[in-house]
Amino acid sequence: MGKQGPCYHCGVTNTPLWRNGPPEKPVLCNACGSRWRTKGTLVNYTPLHARADGDENDDHHRFQRMKSISLGNKNKEIKMLKRKAIQENIIIKRPVFEFSYGLKAAVIEEDASNRSSSGSAVSNSESCAQFSSADGSPSQSNAWDTTVPCKRRTCVGRPKSSSVEKLTKDLYNILQEQQSSCLSVSSEEDLLFENEMSMVSVEIGHGSVLMKNPHSFAREEESEASSLSSIENKSSISDAYSHSVKRVEIGAVRGSYYGGQTIKQEQFKRTKSQTERVHVLGSHGSPLCSIDLKDVFNFDEFIEQFTEEEQKKLMNLLPQIDSDDLPHSLRMMFESAQFKDNFSLFQQLIADGVFDVSSSSGAKLEEIRTFKKLALTDFNKSRLVESYNLLKEREKGTGDSVTTTSKSSIPNVPKNIVTIKRRYENQIQVKSESRGLMRSPKRVMKMKASHETENNVSCFRPRSLASVFAQEGGSAVFSYEGNCSSDQDLLLLDLPSNGSFPQAELLHQL
């Protein structure tokens, strides 16, 4: 009696020839028996007829999966068409409402979009549920594997999109549809204009915030600003869509108006502060008279407080000897006794009102400017302090007179003396010559002489000092005005031109 199946290895019941096998599998089919005879083992071997049955089952499962996916896609398309119709209906009705109702419509539109997004998620989850529950067989669990064979009898796999990736793709498609449907609307609708209506919060449900909080709306005093705000408060959402270009122009005009007003106010404040500073520093009660200028005008403050450009501008006012060997020469200038002594002279000029425009009633503003300009431009030949001290000494002299001495009464006159000559206009020859010693800019030594000439009280004005710089050369003429007599003599000064006066730099600051 011949052998009968089934095969102990593959399980088939029909075969052309039954063959012998190993003791654990005594009966084998033709294919398995041939494998045993040639190879001597049946490990990892599956005959072709067994593989064909498995492929048929796989094809059946694959057909069921594709069927469920197609049903899910059809449901998705139907829901997307419904959602698009709802959105178009809302967009058509939206411009009819006013601004208050427009906000509510925007919230409704947002809720609709949220519902559509959630609906797409639900539909996607439903499709996934259909995909997983289409077939109850155990082999259906392979649908959730990460790889699916792309060809028969191959081990090469390709990645399968997960449910999260599918949901992301659906949301991206929905976003593109919304953007394409809103192309007809102007881009100005994204700009939320300021409104005076009371609102619970500045956030209005769009994820946007108003440009200015309506609760903190500042009442402006300018009539132009109030008129612009009233125009904006009365405008509706339909006006915003139909006249968006005009609204942008109004906003631009208002921005330029506020910008111009701010710049003008800053310039006015800066000019006013500078003018007030000049009046305060040049008045009789200037704080420069009561402080120690050595703590302000020194080398350290010059380096710290001024920029490089400002330092260069101030260095141009110095003589060449003080600007050759920097910074050593500059430090020596600040620490020199002559520079420190001139502080008291400068404070004396301020206290007597030389730089006070309001106190000098007889002097014009042009004369003050000329006085300062001449003191700065030719400070090497400046005789400001000497001339000022001489005038003050003439005022303080006993009997309002100036004592002169003859040339022979002063023995051993040094070379750098100041020669003072007086000449009468109605006489041809010189009656008398006088000399006075000026050892420093602080004081003038007067010598008693044999005769005195009477002199009226001289009026000290910036014009009298400005006349010093009007003449070129080594001598200058001082003129006296006001109560001065017409037959006043001319006072001629012959001063050396090699002296530098740092107080000219201080005048520049005023």
Swiss-Prot record:
Any one GO cellular component localisation term in the record:
nucleus
- Keywords attached to this entry: DNA-binding, Metal-binding, Nucleus, Transcription, Transcription regulation, Zinc, Zinc-finger
Q: Pfam families under this entry?
A: ASXH, GATA
What region holds the DEUBAD domain? 284-394
GO biological process terms on file: regulation of DNA-templated transcription
Domain of life of the organism in this record?
A: Eukaryota
Q: Where are the zinc fingers (GATA-type)?
A: 1-55
Which CDD domains does the entry mention? ZnF_GATA (cd00202)
Where, subcellularly, is it found?
Nucleus
GO MF, one term, reads: zinc ion binding
**Family in the record:** Belongs to the type IV zinc-finger family. Class D subfamily.
Report the function annotation for this chain: Transcriptional regulator that specifically binds 5'-GATA-3' or 5'-GAT-3' motifs within gene promoters.
Annotated protein name in UniProt: GATA transcription factor 26
Name of encoding gene: GATA26
